[in-house]
């Protein structure tokens, strides 16, 4: 008995040491990848971030001058509330502090990649992966091209929200594996941070995965005659969700009220006669303008299947990635098959020819990761696998 206890303690110590090693490795990778910019305090030129800073400058200046927080600004749209420009509430100060700790206090944008890795690392541990396997999965997940694309575009709220999705799933997994306290705490905290990151659209899409997982675990529980345990786990998760919503109630309510007066939720009272009978909400073409084309989905494993990116950053400017820069065009020019004038003509056309207006790059997860996904589909058994597979296919369909 004592020998078994010693072995258990030894295993726990090894796992703890492994987790610490993994955290250090992830922090180093994050800093090295963005070296020397993150270390030197250099700032990326991010369109959405720059625009957001400009929009919130008037409100920030008012706070610095008076010590009071304003909920109105004249900096855009002839005046509007600051609910979605610079949402800040006394109730979220603790949440903001937790976010900094979660990013290990690393300089931006290294902290963002670290947050993405640590979140997936926690999820892998919930699935009982060894620490080094969890570390590999975390690195592979975080270095999907999409995350770097949205960092470059300045979609920081979206990125932050996505960093808390994996640990929220981890909490769900632990709850359905009867680790109610651990799962409930992790799920509540991660969901709270997710909502506090203020990109509710991502949380909305994540809800589809939550439902799929709950159904998958229910089917599993029915087969194993453990429906009572499923009910307890679901109850714990429901409480976690309520706590997360309650912690973010001020911002959620303000967003709900404000949405009624926006193009997304309705119409402003200031309308023309032509607008009175217009349908509520966004136009379908507007909503789907940045949707992936069906054949463009192949970029998950073949990055340049639709030509790659439209532009690339170069010395603080965005440069068009034209057809003239392709090896084929240069070979044709060098062989005399096209004239210099024709070559210059190619310089006016982008390499990207997908369905989106433009793109900063393809969403590429990697052939190795995709191969592991297929292997998992074959080797893993049970209803939960099928639920996750259905959710994956649904996400692809929604992306079109």
Residue ranges and their predicted role:
Residues 13, 222-235, 322-346, 372-396, ...:
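Membrane-interface helix-loop-helix junctions at transmembrane boundaries of multi-pass membrane enzymes
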Residues 114-126, 132-221, 233-255:
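Membrane-embedded helix bundles of polyisoprenyl
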Residues 2-14, 173-184, 215-232, 378-383:
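Membrane-interface junctions at the ends of membrane-embedded or membrane-associated helices
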Residues 14-21, 99-108, 129-137, 183:
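Membrane-interface starts of transmembrane alpha-helices
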């Amino acid at each position: 008995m004592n020998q078994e206890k010693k072995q258990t303690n030894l295993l726990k110590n090894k796992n703890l040491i492994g987790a610490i090693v993994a955290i250090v490795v992830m922090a180093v990778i994050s800093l090295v990848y963005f070296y020397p910019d993150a270390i030197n305090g250099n700032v990326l030129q991010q369109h959405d971030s720059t625009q957001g800073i400009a929009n919130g400058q008037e409100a920030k200046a008012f706070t610095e001058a008076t010590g009071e927080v304003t909920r109105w600004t004249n900096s855009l749209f002839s005046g509007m509330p600051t609910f979605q420009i610079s949402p800040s509430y006394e109730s979220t100060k603790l949440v903001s502090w937790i976010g900094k700790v979660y990013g290990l206090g690393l300089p931006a944008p290294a902290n963002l990649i670290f947050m993405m890795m640590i979140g997936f690392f926690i999820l892998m541990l919930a699935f009982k992966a060894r620490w080094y396997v969890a570390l590999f999965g975390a690195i592979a997940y975080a270095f999907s091209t999409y995350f770097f694309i949205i960092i470059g575009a300045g979609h920081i709220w979206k990125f932050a929200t996505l960093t808390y999705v994996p640990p929220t799933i981890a909490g769900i997994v632990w709850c359905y594996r009867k680790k109610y306290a651990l799962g409930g705490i992790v799920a509540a905290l991660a969901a709270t941070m997710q909502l506090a990151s203020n990109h509710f659209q991502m949380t909305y899409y994540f809800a589809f995965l939550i439902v799929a997982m709950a159904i998958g675990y229910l089917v599993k529980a029915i087969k194993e005659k453990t429906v009572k345990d499923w009910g307890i786990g679901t109850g714990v998760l429901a409480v976690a969700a309520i706590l997360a919503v309650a912690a973010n109630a001020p911002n959620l309510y303000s967003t709900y009220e404000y949405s009624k007066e926006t193009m997304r939720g309705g119409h402003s009272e200031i309308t023309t006669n032509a607008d009175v009978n217009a349908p509520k909400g966004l136009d379908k073409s507007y909503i789907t303008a940045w949707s992936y084309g069906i054949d463009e989905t192949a970029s998950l494993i073949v990055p340049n299947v639709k030509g790659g990116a439209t532009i690339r950053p170069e010395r603080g400017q965005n440069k068009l990635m034209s057809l003239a820069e392709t090896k084929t065009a240069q070979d044709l020019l060098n062989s005399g098959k096209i004239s210099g004038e024709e070559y210059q003509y190619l310089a006016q056309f982008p390499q990207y020819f997908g369905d989106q207006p433009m793109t900063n790059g393809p969403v590429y997860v990697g052939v190795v990761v995709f191969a592991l996904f297929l292997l998992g589909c074959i080797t893993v058994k049970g209803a939960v696998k099928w639920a996750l597979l259905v959710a994956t296919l649904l996400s692809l369909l929604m992306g079109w």
